[in-house]
Amino acid sequence: MKTFLFVNPAAGHHSAQRLQFVLERLRQHAIIPEVFQVRTPTEIYSYCDIINKEHEQCLVIVAGGDGTFNAVVNGLNPGSATLAVLPFGTSNVLAAEIGIKSIEDGIEKIVVGKTAYMSLGLLELKDRSHRFVLMAGIGLDGAVVRDVMPLGKRFLRQGAYALSALKCALAWDSSMFEISTPEGDVTCHSVIICNASRYGGNFILESQSTPFTAGLTAICVIGNQRRTYLRIAYDLFSGPKHHNRNLFKVAASAIEIRGTKAIQIDGDFVGHGPARISTEPDFSQIIV
């Protein structure tokens, strides 16, 4: 099988030595990938166009973080490649979600070759659409990601998000918006649309969500005060054993976002509402 490897030199855990280690380990198992060094989504999309023109299905290895993987699935055609991930990024939520503990573990799984079908979320804005692997965040979550400074993300890593959250807390926006699902309408201050169980690392936000089955879960924050989020953060850190009255969950295959709140997908800001979110079942196979 023809193999391609996307590597982001700007990823949080990238180094030339680490990349060389990956290539040597793959070559030991007769896997010799064509390497694409990429820094921007535009570069990723141009290489994905090459892969989309291949007549046979390829193996595409993504050595980067969640943002790099997101750009790859937005550039590829459905079913055009079997995907694999190596956790090179600042945040490697997808790797944790599918049970990849380290770069070495990811290589071993590639060699074994076990796969599962992966379903994605699809965000549709007025003039464009984006796929997402893990989650979409609307409201405060989207605003925090929007206001992260690129240099801060590079050098402070997760600390850059904490600084942005502090900025949003100081300039608090208490306004609400609505989401609409087949189950009804919900008024909320923020909403996380989950296609996976984890959020922001290894925090389990919705244990029933997984990219291996089609379907989304909306986690709606129905309180609009700062202390609401302090309680939610406490529950995330401690592993909640009880129902949080400020959260309302609804499972849905289609969700309409009303209003003009900020939106992020897989940790990258993409725009403002209104928007529509749906699922893209069995987009591709992924190495597990």
Kindly label every feature range from the protein language model.
Residues 16, 183, 187, 210, ...:
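ATP/nucleoside-binding phosphotransfer catalytic cores, i.e., glycine-rich phosphate-binding loops
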Residues 6, 29, 78-82, 86-189:
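Catalytic core of DAGKc-family lipid kinases
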Residues 1-60, 70, 105-108, 183, ...:
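ATP/NTP phosphate-donor binding region
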Residues 9, 63-65, 86-88:
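Glycine-rich beta-strand-to-loop/alpha-helix junction loops that act as flexible
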Residues 68-81:
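Short Gly/Thr/Asp-enriched flexible loops that form oxyanion-binding sites at enzyme active sites
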Residues 152-160, 204-227:
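Gly/Ser/Thr-rich active-site loops/lids in small-molecule metabolic enzymes
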